[in-house]
Amino acid sequence: MEDAKVGDAVPARSHSTMLSPLPVYDHVGVGFGPANLGLCIALHESQEARARDFQMCFLEKEPQFAWHPSLLLPGAQLQVSPMKDLATMRDPTSAYTFFNFLHTEGRLMQYINREEKVPSRREWSAYLAWAARHMAAYVRYAHEVTDIVPVQRDGQCLYRLQCATPSGARDMYARNVSIAVGGA
């Protein structure tokens, strides 16, 4: 899969002042659960990031998106308001709100008409997976970060992320890093 920037999928910039010819991302997220998924969506929708040619990548050790698969028990409900989704508090008009998910899946009316106003954990998991599919250009699955090392170059602080991937070890460089690896 190609490296992605906000707005479309193109390779990150290479800089001649780098320690290596590898691309430098403006942001790399470690883990791709709800926290970094929400950040990815916010950056994807950011006009400022788009104007700056902001380059980002998210690294997830699992081979595909999954939110607490062992806790998706029949009848288990989400414990928070669905308004605390990936985007509503930041931008209620976002295409990535829970209610837009229900609308695009043809289930909004059914959800509104049911007695229970809190989604099931299975429904919430489906929403998160739907959003993750929309952000697929920014994610590298089966990439486990094994080390993060700050490096200096020409007075600029960068972070070298060492990754274990199915094809072997790989280094990546970023100006900023978010770590949201979830519970064990």
Give residue spans per PLM region:
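Glycine-rich active-site loop/strand segments that organize a redox cofactor
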Residues: 6-14, 55, 59-125
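A short, basic/flexible loop-to-alpha-helix module at the beginning of a structural domain
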Residues: 6-24, 48
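Alpha-helix termini
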Residues: 17-18, 44-53, 153-154, 167
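N-terminal Rossmann-like FAD-binding beta1-loop-alpha1 element of flavoenzymes
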Residues: 22-57
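Short hydrophobic core segments
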Residues: 28-30, 145, 161, 170-184
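A structural motif corresponding to the C-terminal end of an alpha-helix
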Residues: 131-140
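A conserved short coil-to-beta-strand element within the FAD-binding core of flavoproteins
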Residues: 141-159
